[in-house]
Amino acid sequence: GSAWTGPDGLTHAGPLIDTVDGVDLISCELCGFVHVIPLPEPEAAAEHYKSDYYTETKPTYLSHATEDAAWQRVLHNDLLLMAETILGSSQRTLVDIGCGPGLILDAAADRGWTCSGLEPSRQAAQFAAERGHTVINAPFTPDVLAEIGEVDLVSMINVLEHVPHPFDFIDWANQLLQPGGLLLLTVPNDFNGFQRTLRATGATDAWWISPHHHLNYFSFETLENLVKSHGFEPFLRTTSYPMELFALTGRNYVAEPEQGRGCHKDRRAFDLAFEAAGLSHVRRTFYERLAQAGLGREATNIAQKP
């Protein structure tokens, strides 16, 4: 195994899972999930998302966000519907942590939620604010908790894989939630069975390991264990289209990135077809069952605070 002792004196140790770009990934016994060692300082990580994430790392993200809006809306509606079913109709306040351009806020506002967002990136926060949302342009720290106030739902979509201290994020989210409130988490579903198959057959490398952007690598189980360790009760799992299916059936977008846009278009068409048919429950059931099998591109969990 490998080990690293952080500035807080805690030792992260466990079996070495992989080494990519000179960075080790371990299955950490202390944390209960796979992460890189050494972990960067929280300040350095926060700085990256404040300044250059949307200009340098994802320069086309905001323009694609608009292009994908109708499709994203369908997926956000699915998530919000699940939350509404658990919460009941009177509880409709949410904060989206790392809200980016605010697409889930658009969906929530249209469904009658009172919503706000927190976003460290200036451009993305501005993009969301220009469309009428209440957005706090700051990283997630204890300093912003009072400003956000108590809510019924805290969502963090594709956030936890980026942060050096996911335990703190769950703890702060817990402080924002009323009793019975919900935590909605989405992270990449990494080292899943489809990915391992592609790698084992030599069709791809471990493309999902990106140690400079993704510090933490979760499965449905390790994500659920993380929330359980904070007293949350995992309620429901779901996922998104298993993109690896394309690579397993002759369209290897990993080895041939030029296939990527076409695959994305087709997965979008898949999700939208059920909408056009008035059968969106079929899509929801499909993704919930896939998640039960540990498959799908993302791991989404809705957990309840006692």
Which ranges hold each PLM region?
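Feature marks short, surface-exposed loop/turn motifs that line or immediately flank catalytic pockets
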Residues: 180, 191-193, 241-243
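Substrate-binding/catalytic lobe of Class I Rossmann-like enzymes that use SAM or dcSAM, i.e.
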Residues: 220-255
